[in-house]
Amino acid sequence: NSGLLDELPALKIQFSHFSGGIGRFLGRIRGFQQRDKWGTAAIAGHGRRPKHPFDHYLEQRLFYDCAGWAGPDHAAEWGAEWVRFGLQEVALSQTLFATDYPQAVRDADEVAGYVAAVRALGPDARAMVDGVSAERLIPDLKQRVRKSS
């Protein structure tokens, strides 16, 4: 809430690993936006007001990927659970599909199992795997991918 997103209106930020589970902290973050209630409105570093409510930036400018489940074992089971929780907390429009391959997960079968398990979560998860949200972050993504292949 420094005003940076207002100063750079085209800037979009992508955080990895659901930003460490940001969905669990959204209520707290929203609460801290109430500067008058907290008595910080008169403090220079805290008193600057953004042009829009916090959720505007959350829904339009901040993106999160779903990598970072737990490591190489049980990628399908634990990875899909991580994505399921994440999609309950962060809008599909802001969630990008990702894996930890080849870092934490080095086995192609584990990755394939993870992808299948995520797709099985339902239409939102399938849309995420298919890149619907990524197209919001990266303009002309499909055209760029076609050119590079």
What residue spans do the PLM features occupy?
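Histidine/acidic residue-rich metal-binding segments in metalloenzymes
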Residues: 1-61, 77-93
